């Protein structure tokens, strides 16, 4: 994988390309794109040395993680995949926030399947849930290691 882009360390050592690719707009929020267009953009980013890709279950919902998963299949080595939790979805619709331990563990398990990977490199909270103490959320995240 060419490294034409500078790299940075996040936190205690996770190395990412200084330029990351947020994939949200490939399947949600902006002008709709065809899945193969998004996959082509991701493939080209990898060719250029981008290693950091961000998605979330809310994007699509679910479709963005699937798109990224298809695009990185067979190319996972050296990539850093980030996804997020924190929304409550019912029948594919956002109905509020939910950062409860049960929800974040469910989101993690389901995201692994949609992405087609064995581990998520960066899993973080998309929105603060005022009904769940942050200590409970962070404690549940620590259990995922």
Regions found by a protein language model. Name each.
Residues 1-80:
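N-terminal binding-site loop/beta-alpha segment at the start of enzyme catalytic domains
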Residues 24-26, 56-58, 84-88, 125-128:
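Active-site beta-loop-alpha junctions enriched in small/polar residues
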Residues 45, 84, 114:
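Conserved catalytic core of Hanks-type protein kinase domains
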Residues 52-55, 82, 119, 124:
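Generic enzyme active-site microenvironment
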Residues 72, 85, 141-144:
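Hydrophobic positions in alpha-helices of CheY-like receiver
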Residues 74-101:
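Structural motif corresponding to the early beta-alpha repeats
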Residues 91-145:
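Glycine/proline-rich, positively charged
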């Amino acid at each position: 994988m060419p490294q034409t882009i500078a790299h940075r360390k996040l936190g205690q050592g996770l190395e990412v390309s200084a330029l990351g690719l947020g994939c949200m707009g490939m399947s949600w929020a902006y002008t709709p794109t065809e899945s193969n267009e998004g996959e082509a953009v991701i493939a080209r980013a990898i060719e250029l040395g981008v290693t950091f890709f961000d998605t979330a279950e809310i994007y699509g919902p679910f479709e963005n993680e699937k798109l990224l998963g298809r695009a990185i299949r067979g190319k996972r080595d050296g990539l850093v995949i980030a996804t997020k939790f924190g929304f409550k979805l019912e029948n594919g619709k956002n109905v509020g926030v939910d950062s409860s331990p049960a929800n974040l563990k469910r989101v993690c398990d389901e995201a692994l399947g949609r992405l087609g990977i064995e581990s998520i490199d960066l899993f973080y909270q998309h929105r603060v849930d005022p009904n769940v103490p942050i200590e409970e959320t962070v404690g549940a995240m620590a259990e995922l290691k």
